[in-house]
């Protein structure tokens, strides 16, 4: 067998755990017996924990690195595509992320930058 096939097989078995030389699996008889003691899903009250939606505040969402990088990529694309950003905030953001803001601010104030 090839090593990459063995590694992929090992990764694709998330339920297999080593316990004193034997492997346990969800289809194990102990697992089935434990599941049969639970009431059926029709008898449960309320949504299942997997279906409950967790609301994320918008500020937490904007604080993620993925959103910041996507916004930076958008500003970079607009900056190089048009060479003039129509939105002053994106222009300010692009200059601050690329480190060009100090060079740009030598003779202008922040309000003048935002007004451009």
Curated annotation (Swiss-Prot):
The keyword Signal applies. Residues 1-19 form the signal peptide. GO terms for biological process: cellular respiration; mitochondrion organization; sterol transport. Residues 18-50 are annotated as: Disordered. Keywords: Signal. This is Putative uncharacterized protein YJR120W.
């Amino acid at each position: 067998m090839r090593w990459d096939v063995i590694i992929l097989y090992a990764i694709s078995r998330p339920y297999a755990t080593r316990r004193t030389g034997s492997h346990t699996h969800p289809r194990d008889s102990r697992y089935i017996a434990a599941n049969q003691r639970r009431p059926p899903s029709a008898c449960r009250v309320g949504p299942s924990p997997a279906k409950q939606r967790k609301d994320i505040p918008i500020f937490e969402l904007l604080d993620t690195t993925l959103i910041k990088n996507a916004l930076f990529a958008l500003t970079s694309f607009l900056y190089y595509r048009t060479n003039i950003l129509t939105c002053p905030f994106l222009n300010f953001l692009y200059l601050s992320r690329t480190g060009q803001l100090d060079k740009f601010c030598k003779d202008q104030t922040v309000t003048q930058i935002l007004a451009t």
